[in-house]
């Protein structure tokens, strides 16, 4: 190719590129495998475990997170998953069990295929300076033990972690945990709804602690009306206005949050709705997320 031909070809390529719409250059992403926290359908699981697991798969969910096995042995629960083409990368385990029964939780995780063991909650009497310091110590020890077993430990937040606590130097308990746990041993399962209700911006935490959030809970919140749940257990006090709702039906800007999934390190997205009344609720959330591009 001579110099003149090269210049003409380059100019032609520039014209074609300039004629493309701006949005064509922007890559879009979607959630490859939407997950469900089974607490959403807890009452249905108590009535018919196998049938409920099958229904979850039929909706389109590809993975689930356990919060108890609803009377089933780990092998029985795993068999139900395998039968329906589901996997369970994560499970919740109470703080008391993490302190006293961690070997059993690890054994269950290996049978079930869990890659994460998550502490889901800190009880109200422990939400003081000494309690948070103790929790950080327990989490670091648990993270070391689970890592040796090929499993990652994590903590799941609510909203009560975002109230300044005396004895922590005015810090938020959530910030205290981030600062006083080893980021390699202790990850965070960020509940995006409860963080928002707590007045915090998930993206700000993604920016300040990149890669710390491999798991997220996805549920929406609307300030309109009020449901039968006062959410005092999650928030630390009764909520007088607003209630949980299906993903896409509330006020949370999911596209803005999920555009930062790479920075956050998100690997698994679990829909949850404490107030779900039927399969219609997890179905609505699934359909929204399955179509969402960001």
Where are these predicted regions, by residue range?
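Histidine-acidic metal/acid-base catalytic patches
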Residues: 4-17, 23-35, 42-57, 174-190, ...
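Active-site acidic/histidine proton-transfer and metal-coordination neighborhood
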Residues: 10, 63, 70, 87, ...
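Acidic (Asp/Glu)-rich catalytic clusters
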Residues: 28-29, 53-58, 72-88, 101-114, ...
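Active-site mouth loops of central-metabolism enzymes
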Residues: 37-47, 91-98, 129, 246
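Active-site beta-loop-alpha junctions enriched in small/polar residues
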Residues: 39-41, 67-69, 93-96, 122-123, ...
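Structural motif corresponding to alpha-helix initiation and N-cap regions
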Residues: 46-50, 71-75, 99-103, 129, ...
């Amino acid at each position: 190719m001579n110099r003149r031909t090269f210049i003409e070809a380059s100019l032609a390529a520039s014209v074609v590129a300039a004629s493309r719409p701006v949005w064509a250059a922007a890559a879009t992403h979607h959630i490859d495998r939407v997950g469900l926290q089974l607490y959403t359908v807890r009452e249905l699981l108590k009535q018919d475990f196998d049938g409920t697991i099958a229904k979850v798969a039929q909706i389109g969910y590809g993975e689930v997170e356990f919060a108890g096995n609803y009377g089933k042995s780990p092998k029985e629960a795993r068999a139900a998953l395998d039968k329906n083409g589901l996997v369970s990368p994560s499970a919740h385990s109470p703080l008391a069990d993490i302190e006293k029964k961690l070997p059993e939780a690890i054994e269950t995780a290996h049978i079930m295929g869990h890659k994460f063991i998550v502490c889901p909650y800190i009880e109200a009497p422990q939400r003081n300076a000494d309690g948070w310091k103790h929790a950080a110590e327990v989490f670091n020890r648990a993270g070391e033990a689970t890592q040796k077993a090929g499993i990652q430990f994590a903590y799941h937040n609510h909203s009560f972690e975002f109230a300044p606590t005396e004895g922590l130097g005015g810090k938020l308990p959530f910030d205290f945990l981030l600062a006083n746990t080893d980021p390699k041993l202790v990850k965070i399962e960020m509940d995006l709804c409860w963080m928002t209700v707590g007045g915090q911006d998930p993206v700000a935490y993604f920016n300040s602690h990149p890669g710390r959030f491999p798991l997220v809970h996805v549920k929406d919140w609307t300030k309109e009306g009020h449901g039968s749940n006062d959410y005092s257990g999650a928030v630390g006090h009764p909520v007088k206005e607003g209630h949980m709702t299906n993903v896409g039906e509330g006020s949370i800007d999911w596209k803005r949050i999920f555009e930062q999934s790479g920075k956050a390190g998100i690997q698994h997205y679990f829909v949850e709705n404490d107030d779900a009344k039927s399969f219609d609720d997890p179905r609505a959330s699934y359909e929204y997320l399955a179509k969402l591009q960001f």
